Structure formats: structure tokens, C-alpha cells
């Protein structure tokens, strides 16, 4: 009669140990899954760089005074700085003279006059009564061409960026769109005509980092333009970064 009792006690003990082990394994799996989910929400592009701001150099006027289609990809990887905010340019669009999507097609008006200024000046316009859109004037004075800054990634001044955007996040939604870039830099139309190659105010800087992989695709939101301009591959973006705007599936390797 004693042997079955001892066997029953031993079985109960083994089952108890098994249950404890199972609970430990489940807790470990849950913890590991939580860590994995936490890792997935981190920004894919680092917010700090090896190049310090003191090493960044202003681009000279002649850098800008070329065809907008040539200037656009060269702007990728460059830096926009205003006050304590520094952004890295990750996406742009070229707008050329005689382009049915370019503001220059209207000729010189009070609104479009900055587009006809010398290359290297800012052209900021209000879109839909809400968004300040930053463009960099290209080519020689009187040509009427520019490059739209569509997206950037943050380098410094994150608190100021978040405050201006009214958004407490470090994810790409912070800067993946031209209106968001203008807001993060605190721009208004008064910045039009400002020379980006002069120290102070709004500056375009080179940090000595070349972009090796570039994506190209048609521009966004220009359905009103002629078909040849709607389909032109004049949108450029840094490859392998999440800091670009939608649609992303229209971008292909250059």
C-alpha cells in the first residue's frame, strides 16, 4: 500500500516541476517578443552622425547654378540648417523651365518671382493654405527652375522639430513630406529670395558624405500637368532609408 503512495507523490512533484518550467519558458518567450517589438519601432536612420556641425561647409553659389534636373540628385545627403535645427535631405523633385508642373510656367508674378532669381536662393510658397513648401532655385537668374525638398531626416534640434511639428515622435512621419519639412524649419514665405549659400538664417551645407544609392520615380501630386511631365522620372530619393514620403512603390533604383 505504501509503494503506490510514494509513486503518486513522485508523479505530483514531477508535474509541479514541469509546470514551473513551462511558466518560466513562456515568460521568457513573452519577454523576448516584447524586446523584438520594441526594437522594431526604433528609427532606421540614426539621429547622430560622425560629421560634426563645425565640419559642415556652405555650398558655393555656383553649386546651384545648373539645370534643376542635375541639381536635384546632388542635393541628396546635403544638410539644411536653421538655428539649432539640422536636417539631412533625403527626397527631392526637379522642376524645370517649360515644365507644365513648374510654377515658372506662369511667368513672373508676385508669387513666382523668387523662382526666376539666381540659383541658390530659397523659394517658399504656401500650398493649400496650410503647408510651407521649401524649394531651392536652380540655374541662372531668369530661367525659372527649382528643386522641391520633399523629405528630410533629423540630425539635430529634435526637440525644436517636434515642438514646431506639434508631434512627439522620432519616426519618419515627422519629416516625410514637404509641408512637414517647412514646418520643422519654421519657414514662411518671407524666406523666399534668401541666399542659402550665405552664413546665418537658412543654410545649405555639405557634410562630406556622398549618397551612393539613389531611387528615382515620377513626381507626386501633379496630375494637372502634361502626360510627359507627369511620367517624367524627376523625383529622387536616398535608397535604404525610411525618411521618404509616399508613394514609395513608384521609386526604382537609378
Swiss-Prot record:
Segment forming the signal sequence: none
Catalyzed reaction equations: Hydrolysis of alkylated DNA, releasing 3-methyladenine, 3-methylguanine, 7-methylguanine and 7-methyladenine
Annotated S-S bridges: none
Q: Where in the cell is it found?
A: Nucleus
The GO terms this record gives for MF are: alkylbase DNA N-glycosylase activity; DNA binding
For bias type Basic residues, the affected ranges are: 1-10
Q: Its Enzyme Commission number?
A: 3.2.2.21
Describe the function of this protein.
Hydrolysis of the deoxyribose N-glycosidic bond to excise 3-methyladenine, and 7-methylguanine from the damaged DNA polymer formed by alkylation lesions.
What is the protein's name according to its record?
Answer: DNA-3-methyladenine glycosylase
Which species expresses this protein natively? Arabidopsis thaliana (Mouse-ear cress)
Species lineage, top-down? Answer: Eukaryota, Viridiplantae, Streptophyta, Embryophyta, Tracheophyta
Gene it is expressed from: MAG
